[in-house]
Every structure is written in C-alpha cells, then in structure tokens.
C-alpha cells in the first residue's frame, strides 16, 4: 500500500473529506487528490508531515515497508529480521562467550564494508551476531582498562545497525532503539569524536522521523563538541577514517547532516548556511573513508534542492556530478541517482527519471528496491502511463520493487 492509499484509509476512518483534510493540512486539494489516486508521488517526507499531523499518525505510518515478496527475492528480509530480533533483546541479558576485542573490531569493520556495498542479505546475519558479541564484551570489560574500547565498538556496531535498517527499508521505531543505544554507548567512552558519531546516528533517525528541530539541535551540539579539535591541520586521511575520522572531516559531515535537516524543515537560509560551512571545510580536508569532500557536498546540494521543491535546480546540480566520485560507497551514488530521478519526475520527465532509477538499481539493487521514495515514484509513473504509451522497462522495474499493486 503506497502512501496515497494510506492517506485515504486514515482520512476515511475519520470521516473526513479530501477538501477538509487539504484545508487543515494547508495543502492543495488537487495535490492531495493526485497523491491519493497514486498519479503523483509526494515530493518528500516533509510533504507528508502536515497531513500526518491532521490524521493523528506518525509520518512513517503513511509509508509502507517494502513488500515481503520483494525482500524475499534478495534475501534481505531474513537478514533484517535477524538484526531486528537482536535489537529487541535485553542487552544485559544476552548470554555468550567473551569475545576477543581485536577480532570483534575486525568483524565490525567487515560488517561496515558490507553496509557500504549495500549487501544487506549478507550483512544481516553477521550484524545480528556482532550486536550480541559487542553487548557481551561491554559486560565482560566493565570497570577494566578495556571498558572504553568495548563501549567504542558497541557504539560503532549500533551505528552500523542504524544505517542498515533504514537503507533496508525498516521504519524508525526499531531504528530508534539502535540510535539511542549508539549514543548512550558513545557517551560512556568520553571521546568527543565517538560521541559525535553517536550523535549523527541519533540525528539521522530524528530527521527521518520528521523531527528536524531536534535533529538540528543534536547536530549543532556535536559540532560544538568537535570544533576545538577541528582546527588542527590535516596532512593525510586517518588510517581508519570511518571510525576515527579527522575532527575537521567529521565536522564537515555534520554540517551536511545539518543541511539535510534544514532542507527537511523547509529552512532555505539554513540549508545555504550549512552547505557553505561544509564547502569551507571540504576545501581543506582530503577525501577520506567517510567520503567527505566536494563531491559529497555537491550531492547533498541535490538532495536539499529537491526537498525544498526546486526540481529544476536539483536536476541542474545533479547532472553536473559524476556519481563515481562518491565511490567506494554504493548507497551514496545510488542516492544521488534517486534524488535526480525525483527532480526529473517532478518535471514530468519520466524517461529520464526511469534511467536514473535503473542506474541506482544497477549500483545498489537491494537498497533501491527497498526504497520507499523509489516505490512511490515508480508507482506514480506507472499510473500516469496507463493512458499513454508505455515507457520501456518501467513495468518490469515496477514488478521488481512491488510497485504494481
């Protein structure tokens, strides 16, 4: 069930007409009608927030998780279920042998590498086991000289879980558990960099849930924490730039997070200010494993433009970026293609939008097929094309991602 059908379902349960809902949510009645009929995809989650508030539901309740049969085709469903089950357990009641911290660190690195490649069907079972192992390690090393290391790797494990669950199509409820545990474990380390990484995870969930103000507050506090160390000159990337980034690179990434939260909150001046800050940092920081640099700043500019409703600007920015510059991560170039596709679709250029989505699928098939916005876009394109000539490949794509029904 796509968001339009869910909006209609909740609206009818309340005995509310489209005109009344549109008036209370301050949206166009024609826009609401098109979304409910499935001929137009919501431009962003931000568009659904006022509608959800009137209906008395969470914005994420208006977006269905990926269809089970689609996730079964890639094996994603079983892997994600294992991670969800691991997070539902009481972390202080997990029973297991004490893991070796060096081995645990190496395996967490392997899990993060799988996440960067969007290989969720392989990642799920490994990450579920690592959550239990990291929780066991913390209990085993309490009040010892290795306690900080144990909490550090526990925080990193939860961080990988946060991004994995969202990219694999899970809602924010279970992901919030991982984010809160990530931030709590990070605080136990006393390390400003680890704490800022934990704050990023928490802000990520807040922003996706529509709580942009809280996300921005979390991000700006983290920037303040790492700022004192960020002025040191950077000669070369850190040896482990994802888990131990240079403070200046981390601060730049936080500015990008702030730009994303500002865009979701429709704060155009805030977006411009945060992107300028990120550009300033990117000019003096080498590219690193976090992929903070000019290409990543440019990609966030595309996202911000489409979130702010400027499809033409999103396409203009996006077509000027070589997605390969965002490698070795697979999700980041794939998301660039998806954001550009959103711009093309908003302009009515379905063929160009389809091309970009197919590029995203080629690069990161599991992530693209689970992505709620992709399903919305493809479903709307299919409905628009029912009375016109079919776009080659569109219905095949719709079948693969479960956007036909």
Kindly label every feature range from the protein language model.
Residues 1-14:
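A short, Lys/Arg-rich alpha-helix, primarily the initiator
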Residues 7, 18-22, 32-36, 62:
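Conserved hydrophobic/aromatic packing and binding residues within compact polymer-binding modules
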Residues 11, 22, 52:
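The alpha-helix within a helix-turn-helix
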Residues 26, 46-61:
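DNA major-groove recognition helix of helix-turn-helix/homeodomain DNA-binding modules
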Residues 26-42, 50, 67:
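Recognition helix of helix-turn-helix/homeodomain-like DNA-binding domains
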Residues 56-71, 297:
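Short C-terminal boundary/hinge segments that cap the last helix of small helical domains
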Residues 64-95:
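Short, charged recognition helix plus adjacent turn
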Residues 104-108, 112-405:
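Conserved binding/catalytic microenvironments
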């Amino acid at each position: 069930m796509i968001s339009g059908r869910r909006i209609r379902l909740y609206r009818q349960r309340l005995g509310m007409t489209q005109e009344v809902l549109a008036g209370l949510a301050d949206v166009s009645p024609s826009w609401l009608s098109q979304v409910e009929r499935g001929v137009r995809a919501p431009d962003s989650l931000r568009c659904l927030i006022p509608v959800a508030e009137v209906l008395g539901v969470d914005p994420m309740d208006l977006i269905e998780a990926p269809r089970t049969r689609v996730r079964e085709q890639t094996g994603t469903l079983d892997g994600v279920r294992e991670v969800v089950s691991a997070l539902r357990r009481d972390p202080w009641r997990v029973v297991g042998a004490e893991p070796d911290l060096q081995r645990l660190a190496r395996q967490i690195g392997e899990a993060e590498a799988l996440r960067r490649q969007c290989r969720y069907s392989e990642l799920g079972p490994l990450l579920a086991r690592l959550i239990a192992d990291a929780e066991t390690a913390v209990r085993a090393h309490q009040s010892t000289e290795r306690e900080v290391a144990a909490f550090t790797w526990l925080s990193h494990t939860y961080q990988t879980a946060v991004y994995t669950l969202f990219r694999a199509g899970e809602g924010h409820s279970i992901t919030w558990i991982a984010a809160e545990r990530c931030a709590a474990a990070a605080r136990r380390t006393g390390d400003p960099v680890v704490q800022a990484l934990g704050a990023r995870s928490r802000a990520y969930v807040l922003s996706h849930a529509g709580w942009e103000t809280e996300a921005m507050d979390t991000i700006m506090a983290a920037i303040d924490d790492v700022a004192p160390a960020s002025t040191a000159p950077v000669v070369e990337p850190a040896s482990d730039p994802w888990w131990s980034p240079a403070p200046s690179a981390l601060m730049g990434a936080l500015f990008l997070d702030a730009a994303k939260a500002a865009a979701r909150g429709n704060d155009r001046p805030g977006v411009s200010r945060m992107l300028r800050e990120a550009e300033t940092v990117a000019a003096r920081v080498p590219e690193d494993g976090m992929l903070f640099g000019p290409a990543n700043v440019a990609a966030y500019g595309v996202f911000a433009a489409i979130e702010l409703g400027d499809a033409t600007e999103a396409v203009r920015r996006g077509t000027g970026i070589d997605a390969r510059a965002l490698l070795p991560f697979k999700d980041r170039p794939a998301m660039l293609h998806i954001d550009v596709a959103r711009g093309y679709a908003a302009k009515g250029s379905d063929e160009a939008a389809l091309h970009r989505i197919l590029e995203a699928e080629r690069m990161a098939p599991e992530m693209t097929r689970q992505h709620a916005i992709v399903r919305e876009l493809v479903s709307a394109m299919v409905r628009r094309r029912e009375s016109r000539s079919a776009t080659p490949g569109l219905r095949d794509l719709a079948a693969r991602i479960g956007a036909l029904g």
